[in-house]
Amino acid sequence: MVRLVPRAFAATVALLAAGFSPATASADPVLVFPGMEIRQDNHVCTLGYVDPALKIAFTAGHCRGGGAVTSRDYKVIGHLRAIRDNTPSGSTVATHELIADYEAIVLADDVTASNILPSGRALESRPGVVLHPGQAVCHFGVSTGETCGTVESVNNGWFTMSHGVLSEKGDSGGPVYLAPDGGPAQIVGIFNSVWGGFPAAVSWRSTSEQVHADLGVTPLA
């Protein structure tokens, strides 16, 4: 499923999502960052990536709700702009099946957008990064915190992880990233679900291509 909230979109920080006005934003500035807890209707998820320049944030598409996106303490941080979500409803998925699962959130004018993870490390976007089985990755979710392991398999727009990567309810949408010794982390996925007993994420490379097709921008930081 692909859904765009009907409103003209341009790559500027002045964009507002459909139905959003500055008056709906919280009077107190909110820091928006990858790894923070977000709420939409009755869904609790993790924010995956924040582009401070575009003032757009990303999480899993299946986290979507019908109204505003808020922080843990229900302060409005923005509104949904676009989603793709074809996450299978069963307990299994074939490796050749394409999984798309992202949500783009246009951030409110009065929030502070940051790309710093809870660990203090910057999270950068390099959409051209190609993953390989056995590669070391980490995942951050609001329920499990940061857990690290390796890529188990690379599939059609998504990949699975093992050897230490954990997930529980609330971790959906969280960032999966390369965490080299020293320097910034590089996002490589948005956490999706657990398939065949393995935690899984949609590829950031594929997601970035979908974002470009849907919104005409490429998340970079």
UniProtKB/Swiss-Prot annotation:
Keywords: Signal
InterPro entries, A to Z: Peptidase_S1_PA, Peptidase_S1_PA_chymotrypsin
Gene Ontology annotations for the cellular component aspect, listed alphabetically: extracellular region; peptidoglycan-based cell wall
Superkingdom as given in the UniProt entry: Bacteria
Stretch forming the signal peptide: 1-26
Induction cue: Positively regulated by alternative sigma factor SigD, probably directly.
Keyword NADP assigned: no
Name of this protein: Uncharacterized protein Rv1815
Protein source organism: Mycobacterium tuberculosis (strain ATCC 25618 / H37Rv)
Phylogenetic lineage: Bacteria, Bacillati, Actinomycetota, Actinomycetes, Mycobacteriales
